[in-house]
């Protein structure tokens, strides 16, 4: 019996270890964590965090032995249930056929863990790993390990992405469902045995599909470009899903904001002027540490397109393909309207269509972001007090006897008309007093639209809220208290532990960001119906010179040393992309200055994926005046002062 168990363990491990180290094709899906994505405009280093996580999180090591024990138990049970030896022989033949590839114990165990339970694939890498390039530690990862890890995870996540892009592939959809079931089931439940058998059978099916589906990979490579430029950071498909999860959250929230703003008057132009910059906000990993977030990641494939716009426009701190363009669309002042950004809230930073409009609705979030709270102008604060007083008056008005029936009917009619052009901040709704004068009152959290997992938001109080609507409604109720003043939207997604950013890590940002911005422009320039018209004639003329340059470094998982060498050698190719990104963010108002509210949407979307983003913004504001000028922005990216030109902002 022991001999059989040992053989089963060996076979299980062999199946778990990726047998092909070939890189993805140029058209492969440039997901957020894909380690090798030549075509992607994503920034490298996502895979390093898988290794770094093993080093920084000893708890993962403790999970490995338990995973092996679980597999032994599963194989023993499956053997007792008439699992024939011929199946074992098939697995062994499959192993021999795939090739003999050496993998260190740590890597093998990591792959095994991923295969045994897709419910915790995201726990294998650092939480900071996200849409933006990971830390420089990538250069220390063995290429074979990166390739193996990528391949192992790819075999797990391939069905997920395919199920979203090609619904008619039932086998992939089945695996998606099974992966979600495994997340909700406890390893000790008897159903684990059945899931293990199904996983092994699916793996056999996946390997041939993996090898013979270049067209799928090409479609996937294009799909993320359209729907999730933010998650186009290089990494495995699994990490990509997680990224998608987070990026999709702004989109979901933007829809909620739109609904809310429609109810509460969309014409708050006068109020927005009173609130100043904070109300005119401008506009991303990773790997959640909970099974719930794993599910979010898979569901996020559909919504990520919307998030990309928000992340990208906010600020290209974390090169996530195409995250730059519409990212800033994501968050804006309390206007709750969708006119704050010119790009969509989806992570498809380059799609100037429906997602483009949805991104604009996200602008209402930035007013409440970490920095937005501190930037409230005196006018904004006085308005808060005025609204608080209005709330009390509204309550008195509601408790007092109403006018005659005829007057009441006229009042309601006038009320509807008044609120139509009267906007309130997030967490408030418009109501009218008996005289028909509109004013804002706090929204009841229970009146918020039904929230999904992807709508979750983390507040600065380290509490996870069902949605941003619930968070701002709670903040409104706490107005006048210290807790209410401090409560802001920290980032999208459930709250998690975010490590501190080191000097070494933040120093690598400009390298990855410049390359990322350049690659995004290349993608926008290439013929694509969904991207058509995004760049104007002047922009296309500038980008064309870079696109046709034979010396251009193609998108891919490049080491920091190569990025640095290319920047020195082809410096002229990076000047315009930096100016273009600044112009994309500087929208509300377009005054050649970036405020925290204009950067906030990108930050909120990327904080859970890239922990250095906040510090990066601080580094770009050396005088600490909470404003980043074009000159400061250019210096932050290593552009020479003589090459910083406002004429390039078009």
From Swiss-Prot:
Main location: secreted
Segments of skewed composition (Basic and acidic residues): 54-64, 75-85, 277-299, 382-398
Domain Kazal-like: 436-497
Tissue specificity note: Highest expression in brain. Moderate levels in heart, adrenal gland, epididymis and lung. Low levels in kidney, eye, liver, spleen, submandibular gland and testis.
Alphabetized InterPro entries for the sequence: EF-hand-dom_pair, EF_Hand_1_Ca_BS, EF_hand_dom, Fol_N, Follistatin/Osteonectin_EGF, Kazal_dom, Kazal_dom_sf, Osteonectin_CS
Signal peptide residue numbers: 1-16
Annotated glycosylation sites: 148, 168, 462
Compartment(s): Secreted, Extracellular space, Extracellular matrix
PROSITE patterns: EF_HAND_1 (PS00018), EF_HAND_2 (PS50222), KAZAL_2 (PS51465), OSTEONECTIN_1 (PS00612), OSTEONECTIN_2 (PS00613)
Any single GO CC term annotated in Swiss-Prot or TrEMBL for this entry: extracellular space
Entry-linked Pfam families: FOLN, Kazal_1, SPARC_Ca_bdg
Domain Follistatin-like, first and last residues per copy: 418-440
Bias kind Acidic residues: ranges: 91-101, 189-210
Record's compositionally biased regions (Polar residues): 116-126, 135-148, 157-174
PANTHER family attached to this UniProt entry: SPARC OSTEONECTIN (PTHR13866), SPARC-LIKE PROTEIN 1 (PTHR13866:SF16)
Family: Belongs to the SPARC family.
Name of the protein: SPARC-like protein 1
Species of provenance: Mus musculus (Mouse)
Lineage: Eukaryota, Metazoa, Chordata, Craniata, Vertebrata
